[in-house]
Amino acid sequence: MPFALNVLRHRFLLGPNCWTYRSAMEVWLDLGELEQHPSNTLPGFTDRLLALIPGLQAHHCGVGEEGGFVERLRDGTWMGHVLEHCVIELLNLAGMPTGFGQTRSTSQSG
């Protein structure tokens, strides 16, 4: 089942901003049809994602302990949240350590 993901805008926020006191990257995405498919509704999604980005297994997420994000994936979490963790892990792998992320919906679907 093909899905489209569109980056609507992105910007780098230097120093304190409306999200955090640190510099941050703000990205607005249109998840399209992905918005209607939590992680637990896509067969094999969690295992394939963890095979591609194994560092996600250490993410705490809201559970507060290592593996918390994997628990959320298996229980079902939204794709915006999944992308947030993927971006955090990819930034860490690129030598730009971070642990902060927030996912918010807007008044427009997608």
Residue ranges and their predicted role:
Residues 19-58:
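Active-site-proximal helix-loop elements at catalytic-domain edges
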Residues 1-29, 89-95, 99-110:
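Charge-rich, well-structured scaffold segments of protease-associated domains
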Residues 46-110:
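M16/MPP (pitrilysin/insulinase) zinc-metallopeptidase core fold and M16-derived inactive scaffolds
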